[in-house]
Amino acid sequence: MFVSRRLATSARLRQFAYQPRAIPIQTSSFSTSRCHNAISDSLRQKAQQNNQQFKLDNLFNVKDKVALISGGGTGIGLMATQTLAVNGAKVYITGRTEEKLNRVAELYGKEIPGSIIPVPADITSKESIQNLADAISQRESHLSILINNAGISSHTQTTEHDNANDLRKSLFDDPDATIKDWEDVYRTNVPQLFFMTTAFLPLLKNGSKTHHGWSSTVINISSISGIVKTAQHHFAYNASKAAAIHLTKMLANEISGSPESRLPIRINNIAPGVFPSEMTTGESDEMQKSYIPKEKYEKKTPARRPGKDEDMGSAVLFAATNQYLNGQTVVVDGGYVLAAGSV
Ligand SMILES: NC(=O)c1ccc[n+]([C@@H]2O[C@H](COP(=O)([O-])OP(=O)(O)OC[C@H]3O[C@@H](n4cnc5c(N)ncnc54)[C@H](OP(=O)(O)O)[C@@H]3O)[C@@H](O)[C@H]2O)c1
């Protein structure tokens, strides 16, 4: 018998089509094949115990953890410092300006469950990182949280030119557009993540042994500038932050991801959008805090505002405590990347 090709195809398709099965009508609303027995008191108790795991105290507990934060005296580093210290961690803060660090310890380190301890260092110098590691090792047997936050921005240039000569004038002829500027921003924002992390590996490993159920963690503060496709008028800074994100992933892979190493240390990065800091505003007040008027970002971010202390604080707690987070970028930007677009 002749069957057209079209008919044969539709017959074949019907063969694989969803066939509804006849479901027997239940005589009672309680099916013994699907549900367990009635709920006993001991089962209820077990459920109560299970509920405890979801308490904030358990999920986001940093009490008695030892932390080190670079650039902890201002901006985002200060937000991270306060977050950990007011929740019971012992937080060492480092930076080049001792006065800033001391002021933070005096202002924010009193009458809180944790503590803030200044230790000055320059994270662009390997020798200074070594001295810092020695200083912390002399005081502590372990480190639970390392936040590599210190960073600087680069020279800014306009890109809004519609002819080659003007664009060249802005990007090349500008006397402040120097290779040294690129080197400076790279030196501060990138190699330090490598040298700080590797200098503290033994202390970090001890941190995982010290607290049951805790793997020590490195959190690099990168930026959405390493993700968006626009140069935001600072090519060198954005290139350095893209490098910071990639370096975080390589470190996570080599230190804890590969079967050869598998150290119990989680390495992630937080990519902030715009937050008030000395970098973004050029100054800080007597509280060592900086301020950006909300209106300035009304049209620039879907959140219609710059980031707040609490936005950064909750991201830091999440990245520090979530034991299943490793090798990732946590973007906290009020939707900036959504609007600006990524590469
Ligand atoms: N604020 C934002 O909108 C934003 C957005 C995305 C990413 N970020 C990143 O967040 C991090 C913190 O920046 P911030 O915005 O909070 O700016 P900030 O207030 O200027 O903080 C930077 C901190 O880093 C320290 N620092 C700089 N160079 C150092 C060095 N060589 N050795 C040791 N410490 C050094 C500074 O202290 P000293 O000068 O005393 O050394 C300062 O406390 C940076 O990595 C930045 O790229 C910021």
Residue ranges and their predicted role:
Residues 66, 71-75:
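Conserved glycine-rich cofactor-binding loop
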Residues 87-103:
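Conserved glycine-rich Rossmann-like NAD(P)H-binding loop of the short-chain dehydrogenase/reductase
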Residues 99, 120-135:
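The beta1-alpha1 cofactor-binding region of Rossmann-like NAD(H)/NADP(H)-dependent oxidoreductases
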Residues 106, 161-162, 258-262, 269-301, ...:
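A glycine/serine/threonine-rich, flexible loop-to-helix segment
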Residues 152, 156-186, 194, 202-263, ...:
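Catalytic loop of short-chain dehydrogenase/reductase
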Residues 261-266, 325-328:
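Short, small/polar-rich loop/turn modules that mediate ligand/substrate recognition or access, typified
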Residues 305-332, 337:
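C-terminal substrate-recognition "lid" of short-chain dehydrogenase/reductases
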